[in-house]
């Protein structure tokens, strides 16, 4: 993964019109946790992808799953 991250990771989520109510936004902290190397998650059926932008205008795709307590686990972050 390219490394222009650390705290340049300020994401403005792109608004989606019909977002399911309980679906949480992926926060910058979630992403930072992943980039700082948490052990890889077990594969999960309900992965979701959120698109966002970094401040310098690159696109981001954040793939995440929801854990039990509504907590979000980010699986991968790509700048395609």
Please tell me what each predicted stretch does.
Residues 1-80:
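Ribonuclease/tRNase effector modules and their secretory precursors
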């Amino acid at each position: 993964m390219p490394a222009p991250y650390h705290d340049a990771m300020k994401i403005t989520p792109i608004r989606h019109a019909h977002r399911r109510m309980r679906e949480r936004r992926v926060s910058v902290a979630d992403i930072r946790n992943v980039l700082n190397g948490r052990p890889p998650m077990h594969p999960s059926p309900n992965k979701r992808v959120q698109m966002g932008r970094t401040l310098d205008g690159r696109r981001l795709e954040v793939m995440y799953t929801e854990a039990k307590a509504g907590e979000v686990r980010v699986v991968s972050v790509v700048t395609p």
